[in-house]
């Protein structure tokens, strides 16, 4: 006999508790442009003083990295990942993130877990100037197993039309600057999980130190590049930018330039972190496929004039980033050449 909605597997009271736990963190991200309080049907955001604004949108999720989070019972870092995957994409066009919305789905809602996830989303928003203006938490018993969660996000950014970066200014002879990743970011985890399923924890700790677990390394959040890259854009003209996600350098770097151009990357210049070398050793996957699956230590790239390379690298270094030149642009068929 079903006597209440709760008997079907949906606990509204747990949902109310989750909202209360989230509120404080969410409100930390709000600014004077946010015109609505939590609970409104739609979020309102005032654009302010822009002459000819262009809105840039992006949406993404975290993928199977969530399974590691669920096994480790650590959920905050994947909230940061969710934001990073979206804001880094809109950043590629020169846009400053304005606001963010999240979507959380689960089999059985645990208010504490939901709050932990959203605390990570909040942290990601604070790192990227984005206001967390809304979201949806969907408890879906029978669709998801108890203990399973999925999270996705949606971001809107803004840029003046004359400052829009669309790749049309990229030309032969431009140089490619790499900005280091923090690890796997949020891509390639189906392979990562397969490779490390039976991996010897002691060997792993020897590589990274006694106080670092495999979970710590695999759950390192995706780096958010918004603040340092916007600083670069204040001082320099950047012709193209690429967020290196699924498909690695092979799929993502060509996206920021015209079809008649090809990026050339010198693999001996790419500073590949040890974790990727461990993947190579454990899987025996060919080098080219690794570069076409993972970021291989390069999380973001800028295509710039040769005269600006040194000073841009100096600026990024002063902002705490690891940046270095990895290649250039040639006439070609739009495919990446790894030399």
UniProtKB/Swiss-Prot annotation:
Quote one Gene Ontology molecular function term: phosphoribosylformylglycinamidine cyclo-ligase activity
Keyword Protease listed? The answer is no
Q: Which reaction does it catalyse?
A: 2-formamido-N(1)-(5-O-phospho-beta-D-ribosyl)acetamidine + ATP = 5-amino-1-(5-phospho-beta-D-ribosyl)imidazole + ADP + phosphate + H(+)
- Which InterPro entries has this protein been placed in? PurM-like_C_dom (IPR010918), PurM-like_C_sf (IPR036676), PurM-like_N (IPR016188), PurM-like_N_sf (IPR036921), PurM_cligase (IPR004733)
User: What keywords sit in the KW lines?
Assistant: ATP-binding, Cytoplasm, Ligase, Nucleotide-binding, Purine biosynthesis
Its main subcellular localisation, reduced to a broad class, is: cytoplasm
Enumerate the Pfam families for this protein. AIRS, AIRS_C
Q: Does the keyword Iron apply?
A: no
SS bonds (residue pairs): none
EC annotation from Swiss-Prot or TrEMBL: 6.3.3.1
The entry's cellular-component GO terms read: cytosol
**Transmembrane annotation, as ranges:** none
Spell out the Gene3D superfamilies in the cross-references: PurM-like C-terminal domain (3.90.650.10), PurM-like, N-terminal domain (3.30.1330.10)
The highest taxon in the source lineage is: Bacteria
Q: Where in the cell is it found?
A: Cytoplasm
Q: Under which pathway is this protein filed?
A: Purine metabolism; IMP biosynthesis via de novo pathway; 5-amino-1-(5-phospho-D-ribosyl)imidazole from N(2)-formyl-N(1)-(5-phospho-D-ribosyl)glycinamide: step 2/2
Q: Which GO terms describe its biological process?
A: 'de novo' IMP biosynthetic process; adenine biosynthetic process; purine nucleotide biosynthetic process
NCBIfam families the record matches: purM
What family is this?
Belongs to the AIR synthase family.
Protein name from the UniProt record: Phosphoribosylformylglycinamidine cyclo-ligase
Q: What is the originating organism of this protein? A: Fusobacterium nucleatum subsp. nucleatum (strain ATCC 25586 / DSM 15643 / BCRC 10681 / CIP 101130 / JCM 8532 / KCTC 2640 / LMG 13131 / VPI 4355)
Q: What is the lineage of its organism?
A: Bacteria, Fusobacteriati, Fusobacteriota, Fusobacteriia, Fusobacteriales
């Amino acid at each position: 006999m079903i006597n209440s909605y709760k008997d079907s597997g949906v606990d509204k009271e747990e949902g109310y508790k989750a909202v209360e736990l989230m509120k404080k963190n969410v409100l930390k991200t709000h600014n004077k442009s946010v015109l609505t309080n939590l609970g409104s049907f739609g979020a309102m955001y005032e654009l302010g003083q822009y002459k000819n604004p262009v809105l840039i949108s992006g949406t993404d999720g975290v993928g199977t990295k969530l399974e590691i989070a669920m096994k480790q019972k650590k959920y905050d870092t994947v909230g940061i990942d969710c934001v990073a995957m979206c804001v880094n994409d809109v950043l590629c066009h020169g846009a400053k993130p304005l606001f963010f919305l999240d979507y959380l789905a689960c089999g059985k809602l645990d208010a504490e877990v939901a709050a932990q996830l959203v605390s990570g989303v909040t942290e990601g928003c604070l790192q990227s100037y984005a206001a967390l203006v809304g979201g949806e938490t969907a408890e879906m018993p029978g669709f998801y197993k108890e203990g399973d969660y999925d999270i996705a996000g949606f971001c809107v950014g803004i840029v003046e039309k004359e400052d829009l970066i669309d790749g049309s200014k990229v030309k032969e002879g431009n140089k490619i600057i790499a900005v280091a990743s923090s690890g796997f970011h949020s891509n390639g985890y189906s392979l990562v999980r397969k490779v490390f399923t039976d991996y010897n924890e002691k060997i792993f700790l020897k590589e990274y130190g006694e106080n670092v677990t495999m979970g710590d390394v695999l759950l390192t959040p995706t780096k958010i590049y918004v603040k340092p890259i916007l600083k670069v854009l204040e001082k320099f003209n950047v012709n193209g930018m690429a967020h290196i996600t699924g498909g690695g350098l092979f799929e993502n770097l060509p996206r920021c330039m015209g079809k008649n151009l090809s990026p050339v990357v010198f693999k001996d210049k790419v500073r590949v972190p040890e974790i990727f070398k461990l993947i190579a050793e454990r899987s025996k996957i060919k080098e080219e496929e690794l570069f076409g699956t993972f970021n291989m230590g390069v999380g973001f790239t800028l295509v710039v004039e040769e005269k600006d390379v040194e000073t841009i690298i100096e600026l990024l270094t002063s902002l705490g980033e690891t940046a270095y030149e990895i290649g250039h642009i040639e006439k070609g068929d739009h495919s990446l050449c790894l030399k």
